[in-house]
Amino acid sequence: MRAILMGPPGAGKGTQAADLITRYQIPHISTGDMFRAAIKAGTALGMKAKEYMDAGSLVPDEVTIGIVAERLAEPDCSKGFLLDGFPRTVAQADALDKILTQLKMNLDGVINIEVPEAKLLERLTGRRICRQCGGTYHMVFNPPAAEAVCDKCGGELYQRSDDTLETAKNRLQVYNDQTQPLIDYYREKGLLKEINGDQDIAQVLQDIVDAMEHGHD
């Protein structure tokens, strides 16, 4: 299976990626992991990426695309792969098409996990952390017995600044603005598999497997 995994923050991509790579015995390729591996290996492109990252700059497309090309050419990708976090733009998607053509590979599908915005915001803003012991709770999935009090030590629970409603809304807006053209691009190519992420984890996985193996959207 050669696939791209897409979905907004809070859609549960990480959980699905872990299950898919185990099921299909394929590598999970995320841009962050690729950059780290290329830097560790000391490749020319890895060193170039490190310069930008150390300066706090975005790594330019030609470097990112070069690192992706090197990674997909490795033997463990011959039976398939799950790309996560790449491509992010239509320009990167075009470049990926060229890479796959050179490697004589076809993309089997683009999995897009969809969850209503209200649910995403609930997931993204629900986390609470204990100031004393660092214990983590979620107001929906794993709530404390008493609101704002840690079950373990009685410490005060607080919400991190990057878990606030305003921050979460901004993250979703940035994601939607950036990826909508990409979703349209893959829909036009007939590769987009739209998956309902607002159901239990096992059902989401089953829907992905059905869509990839039987071609149902």
Swiss-Prot record:
One of its GO terms (molecular function) is zinc ion binding. The keyword Transmembrane helix does not apply. Zn(2+) binds at C130, C133, C150, C153. SUPFAM superfamilies: P-loop containing nucleoside triphosphate hydrolases (SSF52540). Its main location: cytoplasm. InterPro entries: Adenyl_kin_sub (IPR006259), Adenylat/UMP-CMP_kin (IPR000850), Adenylat_kinase_CS (IPR033690), Adenylate_kinase_lid-dom (IPR007862), P-loop_NTPase (IPR027417). It catalyses: AMP + ATP = 2 ADP. Residues 126-163 are annotated as: LID. Pfam families: ADK, ADK_lid. One of its GO terms (biological process) is AMP salvage. Pathway: Purine metabolism; AMP biosynthesis via salvage pathway; AMP from ADP: step 1/1. ATP binds at G10, A11, G12, K13, G14, T15, R127, T136, Y137, Q199. The keyword Cell inner membrane does not apply. Monomer. Belongs to the adenylate kinase family. Consists of three domains, a large central CORE domain and two small peripheral domains, NMPbind and LID, which undergo movements during catalysis. The LID domain closes over the site of phosphoryl transfer upon ATP binding. Assembling and dissambling the active center during each catalytic cycle provides an effective means to prevent ATP hydrolysis. Some bacteria have evolved a zinc-coordinating structure that stabilizes the LID domain. Catalyzes the reversible transfer of the terminal phosphate group between ATP and AMP. Plays an important role in cellular energy homeostasis and in adenine nucleotide metabolism. This is Adenylate kinase. It comes from Desulfitobacterium hafniense (strain Y51). The gene is adk.
